[in-house]
Amino acid sequence: MACGGKRLLFLALAWVLLAHLCSQAEAASNYDCCLSYIQTPLPSRAIVGFTRQMADEACDINAIIFHTKKRKSVCADPKQNWVKRAVNLLSLRVKKM
């Protein structure tokens, strides 16, 4: 009977581990990622915030996701100069608050 109990415990633990891994995979696949970048710069007055997307997390590319006054999310290349300037400007605004 002890052998049967150990087997049942092993199967229960394996099931819990499998359920956890499946939920992690589902969470990563539901993540909304940038797949490309906007080609034209956004006016800085239209941008109200930003989020950083990192390629080493759930997405394939690094990106800055700008949030606009019209509640749009726009993906931009973090290597572009206009993107760097906009991020710096927004960071300064936050520091002044």
From Swiss-Prot:
UniProt-listed Pfam families: IL8
Signal peptide region: 1-27
InterPro entries: Chemokine_b/g/d, Chemokine_CC_CS, Chemokine_CC_DCCL, Chemokine_IL8-like_dom, Interleukin_8-like_sf
GO molecular function terms listed in the Swiss-Prot or TrEMBL record: CCR6 chemokine receptor binding; chemokine activity; cytokine activity
Disulfide bonds: 33-59, 34-75
Family: Belongs to the intercrine beta (chemokine CC) family.
Alphabetical list of PANTHER family matching this protein: C-C MOTIF CHEMOKINE 20, SMALL INDUCIBLE CYTOKINE A
Function, in words: Acts as a ligand for C-C chemokine receptor CCR6. Signals through binding and activation of CCR6 and induces a strong chemotactic response and mobilization of intracellular calcium ions. The ligand-receptor pair CCL20-CCR6 is responsible for the chemotaxis of dendritic cells (DC), effector/memory T-cells and B-cells and plays an important role at skin and mucosal surfaces under homeostatic and inflammatory conditions, as well as in pathology, including cancer and autoimmune diseases. CCL20 acts as a chemotactic factor that attracts lymphocytes and, slightly, neutrophils, but not monocytes.
Name used for this protein in its record: C-C motif chemokine 20
Organism: Mus musculus (Mouse)
